[in-house]
Amino acid sequence: MNALKDLKVKIFADGADKAGMLQLNANPLIKGMTTNPTLMRKAGLTDFEAFARDILQHITEKPISLEVFSDEFSEMRRQALKINGWAKNVYVKIPITNTRDESSLPLVRELAREGVKLNVTAILTLEQVTGVAKALNSKVPAVVSVFAGRIADTGVDPMPQMRAGKKILAGLPQAELLWASVREVLNIFQADDCGCAIVTVPHDILAKAMKMTGMELKKLSLDTVKLFATDAAAAGYKL
């Protein structure tokens, strides 16, 4: 298995914990950042703009994706243009639909033509990837975030779909396919194997990847046995 530093896929950090983001920003292995409203709420954030502007003061070179949070397309557009103006390294995340399952592609097309760097998110089907590909501006950088982990949650292998998604985007050199919803370290290597440009990884899984990638399995086996023995002794079990 390759070392993380030898992979072709760019590893992004997925989270909204400021301390964690700053620590990971200092790591040359991490090439960018992604956030979303759920992660921000989990981090206890209540002021979207204050958080975003603050983090953009510290992370100035690597791309950061910040997501709109309105469910109305006119307000999504206003938020997108505002977020876009905060820094040159910002990508504006637009969900593939709103909560009424109305397509956001007209908005994506409009913003892309205005030169807004977009991260179109919450994609799970190849039909959605095709729609996004048709809506993007070939001259403007964009990210197409396919939630491979959620596909896998349904019992479906996401690898064929991710490879097909890469082919759909082949005519758009500025559009990058992103493997989202990483569940385990293996997903990072799967994203690399299927040719994704980016994989975005939660902070806790990044920590595990940096610790365990390449670990000798016999040593890991012994560590596991020691863990069981330690916990059994601590519990004071008797027969």
Model-predicted segments: where are they?
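C-terminal extensions of enzymes
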Residues: K238-L239
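Non-transmembrane, interaction-prone segments in cytosolic or luminal domains
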Residues: N36, D47, E75, Y91-V92, ...
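Flexible domain-boundary/linker segments
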Residues: R41, A50, Q128, K208-A209
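Active-site beta->alpha loop and helix N-cap motifs at the rims of alpha/beta catalytic domains
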Residues: N2-I30, T34-E110, E114, A148-I151
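Catalytic alpha/beta core domains of metabolic enzymes, predominantly
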Residues: E102, P106-R109, V116-A207, T213-A235
